[in-house]
Amino acid sequence: MNNFSHWNEAGRPKMVDISEKEITTRTAIARSTITLSNEVYQAIQQGGIKKGDPTQVAQIAGIMGAKKTADIIPMCHPIMLQGTDLQFDYEKIDNGYALHIQATVKCNGKTGVEMEALTAVSIAALTFYDMCKAVDKTMVIKETYLVEKTGGKSGTFTHK
């Protein structure tokens, strides 16, 4: 357990003390992909989703998810976010479409926003599924990962 910062000397969970860290500009980009059938894609394009435009609702849900990360991930610090944005890009694949969801989160703070970006894309993907499940429940939420992070003591990370 010594390699993990969220454990105290007694082996119990703790929230890491960031009080001595420098305030720096921090950004994180995360991505998630959900695959969907041609039927779901056509329903979206034709305005046939009864609950409304799933990407618009997923965008709002993703932003809300980023803002609420500290409420649902136990050891995350509450962070004053300066910006959160999501992008949605469809890609035609062999058996339907892939929707790539990307979140960019930014703050000036003492700790990074990686979890906020990952939460944003996760909540957006779940919301998209919820919005479209009446048409087809075979959608699959696939890989969710950190694309890049900048700022802080550890500097820049880029997923390869």
UniProtKB/Swiss-Prot annotation:
Pfam families the UniProt entry points to: MoaC
Residues at which substrate binds: 75-77, 115-116
Pathway(s) this gene product operates in, as recorded in its UniProt entry: Cofactor biosynthesis; molybdopterin biosynthesis
Source taxon at top rank: Bacteria
Signal sequence segment: none
Record has Lyase as a keyword: yes
Record-linked Gene3D superfamilies: Molybdopterin cofactor biosynthesis C (MoaC) domain (3.30.70.640)
EC number(s) recorded for this UniProt protein: 4.6.1.17
Gene Ontology biological process terms in this record: Mo-molybdopterin cofactor biosynthetic process
Catalytic reactions of this protein: (8S)-3',8-cyclo-7,8-dihydroguanosine 5'-triphosphate = cyclic pyranopterin phosphate + diphosphate
Parts forming coiled coils: none
Active-site residue numbers: 130
Keywords: Lyase, Molybdenum cofactor biosynthesis
GO molecular function term, any single one: cyclic pyranopterin monophosphate synthase activity
Keyword Ligase: no
Enzyme class: lyase
Subunit structure: Homohexamer; trimer of dimers.
HAMAP family recorded: MoaC_B
Family in the record: Belongs to the MoaC family.
Function of the protein: Catalyzes the conversion of (8S)-3',8-cyclo-7,8-dihydroguanosine 5'-triphosphate to cyclic pyranopterin monophosphate (cPMP).
PANTHER family: MOLYBDOPTERIN COFACTOR SYNTHESIS PROTEIN A
Designated name of the protein: Cyclic pyranopterin monophosphate synthase
